[in-house]
Amino acid sequence: EIIGGTESKPHSRPYMAHLKIITKQGTFAYCGGFLISREFVMTAAHCKGRHITVTLGAHDVVKKESTWQKIDVVKQFVHPNYNSYTIRHDVMLLKLKEKANLTLTVGTLPLLPQSNFIPPGRMCRAVGWGKTSVKESHSNVLQEVKLRLLDPPACQHFPDFNHNLQLCMGTVFKGDSGPLLCARVAQGIASYAHKNAMPPSVFTRISYYRPWINKVLKEN
């Protein structure tokens, strides 16, 4: 992400979480995520690592502000069927060490009931700190881009695409795992795209995972 996007209005997306990850190899990686309750952040399973620190209330991730809340992750709940080869079931919940303080710049993003299935043609927005062009590195400031939900055949050239589990969108680029918003509700999580950032791209379909999400939240 976020190719062809524009900078978000600072703090207009108070649910956004910036993830700093120490990988199993000991290197740093970065992802986006979003706060779904005071204690939990949702992101992609491909963002898992040895240790994760979440920053809430951020716009430019290199310019510290008084709005920031930095909280360590105490537990990573990777979907039990996540497959790093097919990139199916690319969803993870992060339990925070302490509850986030809800403020004007830190808030939660509602998840819809499970029955919600959005039709192709709908315009949505992807939000995150991803790449702004193929040649650029990640963006320091939060970006967003409008994307159209495509008919499933547009993603059939991805061998592991499954319409029930995933959404086929116009393109975003890698490095993100932020939310896909349709009518201000989280419908997807950025999962993968072509290496050259040509459309389309694949998002995890949140509605399919509601039973698992509800179970994790209830038990923890």
From Swiss-Prot:
Record's catalysed reaction(s): Preferential cleavage: Phe-|-Xaa > Tyr-|-Xaa > Trp-|-Xaa > Leu-|-Xaa
Keywords for this protein: Disulfide bond, Glycoprotein, Hydrolase, Protease, Secreted, Serine protease
Keyword Protease: yes
Gene3D superfamilies hit by this protein: Trypsin-like serine proteases (2.40.10.10)
Residue span, Peptidase S1 domain: 2-218
Annotated GO CC locations: cytoplasm; extracellular space; intracellular membrane-bounded organelle
MF term (GO), any: serine-type endopeptidase activity
Localization: Secreted; Cytoplasmic granule
Disulfide linkage: C31-C47, C124-C182, C155-C168
Entries under InterPro entries matching the protein: Peptidase_S1_PA, Peptidase_S1_PA_chymotrypsin, Peptidase_S1A, Trypsin_dom, TRYPSIN_HIS
Enzyme class: hydrolase
SUPFAM superfamilies for this protein: Trypsin-like serine proteases
Transmembrane segments annotated in the record for this chain: none
Main location: secreted
UniProt entry tagged with the keyword Lipid metabolism: no
E.C. number: 3.4.21.39
Superkingdom as given in the UniProt entry: Eukaryota
Active site: H46, D90, S177
Entry's family note: Belongs to the peptidase S1 family. Granzyme subfamily.
Role: Major secreted protease of mast cells with suspected roles in vasoactive peptide generation, extracellular matrix degradation, and regulation of gland secretion.
Name of this chain's protein: Chymase
